[in-house]
Amino acid sequence: IAISFPMMFSSKSNIKAWAEVLIGFALLFMGLEELKNSVPNLKENTEFLSFLSSYANMGILSTLIFIGVGTILTLVVQSSSAAMALTLVMCYEGYIPFELAAAMVLGENIGTTITANLAALVGNVHAKRAARAHFIFNIFGVIWMIFAFQFFINSIDNYMISNMDLSPVSSVGESVAVPIGLSIFHTTFNILNVLFLVWFVPLISRTVIRMQPSKGEIDEEFHLEHIGAGLMQTTELSVLEAQKEV
């Protein structure tokens, strides 16, 4: 931040843009560090440990349960990025094993589509269709991943053992084994999901058009309901209009 901040006052737009990028990354990692430090020591919480022991060894049912946990977590924090960061921190601290964390990541991919659909409620028909397509895209990705879940977990574990001498499944090596494995899982899942479902884009498009038909020209254009054109003389009324619009 100290290096990037003076660059913000540069007259060149490229330098200012790079300064914003560097400051953004710095704030991101500072936030992750604060999040890691603020997470309580859950290992001393017997109720939490008993919950994990009760639901960690139930096979496919454990996967489904923690997919639901990831979905709910994303809805609560209203951000899949924040939910993913919290999951990574919990993995780093050793609170949850790799398999359950990966299942939570799948749930977070579902949760982020729900928040997008909620945000699209005030949008036009195109925004609503995009939100529906996002939901269909991610939900089908999670469905096919459930069937290949254990294969992916074992493949990532074998890859990391061969190339990094780390094992996220058995937590052999440093404490970063599980977060690294989780990052590989998340990235691989999204790439493969795109490669698989890109061929079904026309079908998804037709489906969301049927799900969200247009109601005419009014529905095609987004417009504010409470805020009119121009600024009002009283700032209190302007704030009130903005609150109603939100």
Regions found by a protein language model. Name each.
Residues I1, I23-M30, T71-L75, V89-E93, ...:
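Transmembrane helix-bundle signature of multi-pass membrane transporters/permeases
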Residues S50-G68, Y95-L100, S170-I180:
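Membrane-interfacial loop-to-helix junctions in multi-pass transporters
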Residues I3-A17, A120-H126:
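Membrane-water interface regions at transmembrane-helix termini and the short interhelical loops
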Residues A2-S10, G24-L35, I67-T74, F140-F151, ...:
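Hydrophobic core segments of alpha-helical transmembrane domains in multi-pass membrane transport
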Residues I1, T74-G111, A120-V122, Q150, ...:
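Membrane-interfacial helix-loop connectors
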